[in-house]
C-alpha cells in the first residue's frame, strides 16, 4: 500500500519505497522507448499537482504532520519531461536553496500544458468552443520552447 502523501515518515518512505519505484519505473520506461526507437515520437510527462513543504514537521494546509513528514507546497515542485524532441539531460529552472520558491525560469502549470500541446503540434491558443458555444483558448499560455532541441 503506497502513497506519495508523506505527512509522516518521509525520509524512510522516500529511501525505501517512493524514490526506488519511481527511479526504476520512469528510467525503465524511457530506456525502453529509446531502445525501441519510439522515444522521439512519445512524450513522457511525470509531475504531481504540488510539491512538499521545504521543512519537515511544518503544517501548511491544516493536515497534521509528524516531525518527519512534509505538507503540501504548491509554490515550488519538480517535473520530468522526456522524448518528443525534448533536449536530453537538460535542466530547466532553479529553486532557492531550500526548494521554497523558484528563482530562475519558473514554469506555471498552464505553461506545462501549453508545452504538451506544442509537442503534439497543436497551437496552445487554438480556439475551441465550450458547451455554451463560447470560444476559449485551449490554454492561455506560451509553450516552454527552450525544452526542445
Give residue spans per PLM region.
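Ligand-binding pockets and gating/stacking loops
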Residues: 1-149
Amino acid at each position: 500500500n503506497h502513497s506519495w502523501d508523506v505527512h509522516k515518515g518521509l525520509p524512510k518512505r522516500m529511501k525505501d519505497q517512493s524514490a526506488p519505484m519511481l527511479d526504476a519505473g520512469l528510467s525503465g520506461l524511457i530506456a525502453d522507448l529509446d531502445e525501441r526507437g519510439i522515444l522521439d515520437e512519445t512524450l513522457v510527462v511525470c509531475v504531481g499537482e504540488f510539491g512538499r513543504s521545504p521543512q519537515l514537521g511544518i503544517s501548511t494546509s491544516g493536515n497534521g504532520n509528524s516531525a518527519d513528514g512534509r505538507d503540501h507546497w504548491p509554490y515550488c515542485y519538480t517535473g520530468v519531461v522526456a522524448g518528443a524532441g525534448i533536449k536530453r539531460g537538460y535542466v530547466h529552472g532553479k529553486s532557492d536553496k531550500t526548494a521554497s520558491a523558484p528563482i530562475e525560469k519558473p514554469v506555471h502549470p498552464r505553461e506545462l500544458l501549453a508545452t504538451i500541446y506544442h509537442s503534439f503540434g497543436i497551437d496552445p491558443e487554438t480556439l475551441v468552443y465550450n458547451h455554451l458555444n463560447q470560444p476559449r483558448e485551449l490554454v492561455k499560455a506560451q509553450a516552454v520552447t527552450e525544452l526542445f532541441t
